[in-house]
Structures are given as structure tokens and as C-alpha cells.
Amino acid sequence: MVQRLPLKHSLGVISLLGLLLFACSDSNVLLDETTSFKEDLGWVQKQPIQFALTVEDTLSSYAMYVIVRQNNAYPFYNLYFSPSIIDGKGKTIQKGLAETILYDPVSGKPKGDGFGDIYEKKFLIYADLKFPRAGKYQIQLEQAMRVDTLAGMVSMGLLLEKRANGKN
């Protein structure tokens, strides 16, 4: 015979589990966000993706990863984009050009992990990023391919992790 807990005890157990999950979250993650594109549109070149964050620890280094998700409608084997880091006063403190290979150029086989016709690839773009001062920042990703609208793009994500003892 199974003995059931009264409702108030069940709520207590559920609350405790929720608290434990929250306490076990990764404190080294400063930002972990994803922006999805409209399915029928893709990534429009003149519409950069923006991520907002607040930096308090300026002594630590951070690793910045981009997570690209695309489907079989993506027309190229690679992706060029421009990541920018903008401080709270609107000044660009870092800008670059990044490329990732999404499909093998010879075989056409997708790189990264896939499920159905959607593939995901995570890659490092900055290994030792430092912020000059505490405050609000914006990270912007601009599509840099030679087409106005990039079909087949599902989403772009950004993961910013504090490096432990100088390493991730």
C-alpha cells in the first residue's frame, strides 16, 4: 500500500527541489540566450541580433561562444558574421569578423549536432575576453554574407562564461 503525503508536504518537497535546482545553476555563466528567426524569413542582414548584459567582475576573463542553428534550406557551407561589443555609452569596444563552417564543402555533410533537418553548432569566438569596466554592455551579431536575407537560419545563441583560473 502506497502512503500519500498531504498536499502541504508535497508542496514543501516540490519547493525544496526547485530551490536545489536554482542553487545548482552554473554561476560561471554570465549570459546564455538565443534569438530565433521567423521561419519563413531567416536572418535579415540589416537586422543585427542584440544581447544585453551587466558585467560586475572586470578582473575575470570570459569565453564567448556562438550557437548556430540552421536547417536544410541554408544555401551555403559557411557563415560569416560580425560580433560587436558595445559599452553602456554606445562605444564599440571590440568588433571582428567570424566564420564558421556549417557543412563539409565537399560532401555537404552538416557539422555539429542534428535532429531531423535542424543542425546546431557551438563554437568559440573569443577565448579571453575582458571587460574594461563594470556596467551594462550589448553584444551584437550582424550577418555578413553577401545576401540580404539568409534563408534556413533557425536561431543564433550566445553563451558567455567566466573562465576558471584562466581556463574553460
Residue ranges with predicted function:
Residues Q47-P48, A98-Y103, P110-I125:
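A beta-strand/beta-hairpin structural motif
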Residues L20-A23:
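C-terminal motif of bacterial Sec signal peptides marking the signal peptidase cleavage site
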Residues P75-F81, G152-S155:
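Short coil-to-beta strand junction motifs in C2/discoidin
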Residues V2-I14:
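Bacterial N-terminal signal peptides that target proteins for export
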Residues S25-N28:
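Bacterial signal peptide processing site
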Residues L59-Y62, F123-Q143:
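Short tyrosine-centred short linear motifs in exposed loops/low-complexity segments
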Residues P132-D148, G152-K162:
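Internal, hydrophobic beta-strand segments that form the core of beta-sheet-rich folds
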Residues V66-Y74, M145:
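Short amphipathic, basic-aromatic surface patches that mediate peripheral association
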